[in-house]
């Protein structure tokens, strides 16, 4: 591979070889040219990186980078240095793939007579499986986002954190701990706590593997800290899309019962649909708990439920369990068919919370439907 450097710069057709007059003439004639940085020779650069400490570079191993392209536009290397200087940038914090560019950038600052900022080259975020840095393709293949927002290309859409339902604070918290910690086992930080605790000197040199499940765990932690009213407001549009609308207090109650099991608000419907619509099918495995004597027991349960006036979860549970104990009925013979009748499967939050939310009439209707169906 050809490398333009001190070994060949004076052996090529360049302004270092031809005269100034010839150079000016060829430029005036419209001949295309580039402007390169003339890297000094025989020098060892001892540079400081906040994360990696002292790093050394031999200038004889560096090439002469293009600063202005043939169309007159500056390259990134030049534009970056000028921008950072004009903006009075104090710290340049970037990925370690830019470490090889550090000597050129420092030499450019020196050539301009400007004070160079401090540099910190962060470790890369690595693939969750295998070796190499995380890429868009990894997210597409394994089903997790790598972009803040949905990214559309002719080949398709790569999902974004916002559209997936991640809280910004959760993503920041997760990313901050990839290659850094505060010296303790603490994992959950508010933004203010992160600002106070974060120190580049504690960033590791080695890359950290991206763990999609840990990412979801962080989002779960932030989700359960949200107020029920906030989550209910976020869930309401999803519910409306499904064709259902309920009173605010009911939705707040539902959210309070399911949020401990959710990672995202988008999961709420799958976890709570039975609060709003009666089951039309019954889980095949769970249906095996429906025995020949079950219909009779469920009819008796209906009579018990009909007689309850204080229809709160705690009171309903007390009365139903007292009836079970008094009649010496195995609790599994009632509770599993009861849940199957209301939910269609053996899942969901506390059974008597479900009963309270859907109400007496709906509870009885669902038991009757299960008796007729199963």
Language-model segments: residues:
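Small-residue-rich helix-loop
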Residues: 228-327
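Structural motif
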Residues: 161-169, 205-211, 245-254, 325-333, ...
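Short helix-capping/linker segments at secondary-structure and domain boundaries
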Residues: 114, 179-184, 224-228, 266, ...
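Charged substrate- and nucleic-acid-binding regions of tRNA-handling and nucleotidyl-transfer enzymes
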Residues: 313-374
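Active-site-proximal acidic segments at structured loop/helix or strand boundaries
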Residues: 182-237, 247, 252, 256
